[in-house]
């Protein structure tokens, strides 16, 4: 891949990680807490609670994947430019 392509992938991975960390995960944490609260009061079933928790874990995994990819793309840029610490 060219330096330009890797830089574009890095930008995308960083933006994805930031969106997940700053926007989607906080909203999902709020939703899980609300679902847990409703479940404790009998308004939601266990299936709804576990589904909310599963979705939260999926977002956490997506964040880890995006952050990992960002690091890998940074390493690739360093390799392509010969600029490593």
Mark where each language-model region is.
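Amphipathic alpha-helical coiled-coil segments
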Residues: 1-62, 69-80
